[in-house]
């Protein structure tokens, strides 16, 4: 068993890394939370790692939401509808995730990481218009997308921003910056719903979660400060981080392939 002090340092450091990457490049950073909790911090049970990671992602998302809200980036009507509707999917997805064997779930998680990496490698389109009418009809169009994104978020215990942001842009036509800001309410709420579902089953390590979150807050501040200086190199940073995700994804697949692909 890992001693408490080294494990605490690993949790703080891992949280700092996730927070730093989130602050530096935005969406996709939280995908590393579960692998870090498993293979660096030393949580032995996959479901506990997923539940603990979901709680950490939730807190970080709400913290980032405050900054975006102050800048006027959040379109609250659509954000609230998306979060409320998607929470139903998150509860259903997390319930299904708890029922699946841990190694099988991690193998699927590894495949998801490859998808996230591929999406990060795609060039982002710049949207400059912000005149889209956000009436209730437009917002309700996002319900189906919200249910799907929430289910995926709950199933894997991730933020799901890589699904939510394009989903909001597709359904409402809102600019990227508003989709990013508005998505954070959903990311935080989905993560909270997933964490509560796992907590009911005793599948959260609260001490490690607190340490991971603490490291994430500090790392996030550092990442945001550095992001300002490296704004012109954002695409390069995305490619580098996508490559890191691919490496970790193959490691996760390798570690859990025996359960899915028995020889």
Segments and roles (model prediction):
Residues 52-66:
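Transmembrane alpha-helices of multi-pass small-molecule transport proteins
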Residues 53-57, 183-187, 208-213:
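Short hydrophobic/aromatic, small-residue-rich stretches within specific transmembrane helices
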Residues 1-21, 34-46, 66-152, 170, ...:
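Juxtamembrane transmembrane-helix boundary motif
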Residues 170-176, 180-185:
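Transmembrane helical segments that form the transport core of multi-pass membrane transport proteins
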Residues 46-50, 180, 184, 238:
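Small-residue hotspots at the loop-to-helix junctions and early N-terminal turns
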Residues 25-34, 157-167:
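Transmembrane helix boundary and interhelical junction motifs in multipass membrane proteins
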Residues 194-199:
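Membrane-helix boundary/interface segments in integral membrane proteins
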Residues 181-192, 246:
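Hydrophobic alpha-helical transmembrane segments of multi-pass integral membrane proteins
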């Amino acid at each position: 068993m890992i001693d408490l002090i080294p494990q605490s340092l690993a949790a703080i450091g891992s949280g700092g890394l996730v927070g730093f990457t989130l602050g530096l490049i935005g969406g996709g950073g939280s995908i590393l939370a579960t692998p870090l909790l498993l293979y660096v911090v030393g949580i032995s049970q996959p479901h506990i790692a997923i539940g603990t990671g979901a709680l950490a992602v939730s807190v970080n998302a709400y913290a980032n939401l405050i900054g975006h809200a102050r800048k006027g980036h959040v379109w609250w009507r659509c954000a609230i509808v998306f979060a409320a509707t998607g929470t139903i999917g998150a509860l259903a997805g997390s319930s299904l995730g708890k029922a699946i064997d841990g190694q099988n779930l991690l193998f699927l998680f590894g495949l998801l990481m490859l998808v996230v990496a591929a999406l990060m490698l795609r060039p982002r389109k710049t949207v400059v218009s912000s005149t889209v009418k956000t009436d209730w009809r437009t917002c309700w169009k996002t319900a189906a997308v919200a249910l799907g994104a929430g289910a995926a978020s709950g199933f894997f215990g991730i933020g799901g921003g890589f699904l939510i942001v394009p989903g909001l842009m597709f359904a409402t036509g809102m600019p990227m910056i508003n989709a990013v800001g508005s998505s954070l309410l959903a990311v935080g709420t989905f993560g909270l719903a997933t964490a509560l579902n796992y907590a009911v089953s005793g599948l959260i390590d609260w001490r490690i979660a607190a340490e991971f979150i603490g490291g994430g807050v500090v790392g996030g501040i550092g990442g945001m400060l550095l992001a300002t200086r490296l704004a012109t190199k954002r695409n390069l940073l995305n490619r580098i981080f996508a490559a890191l995700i691919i490496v970790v994804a193959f490691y996760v697949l390798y570690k859990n392939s025996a359960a899915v692909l028995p020889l």
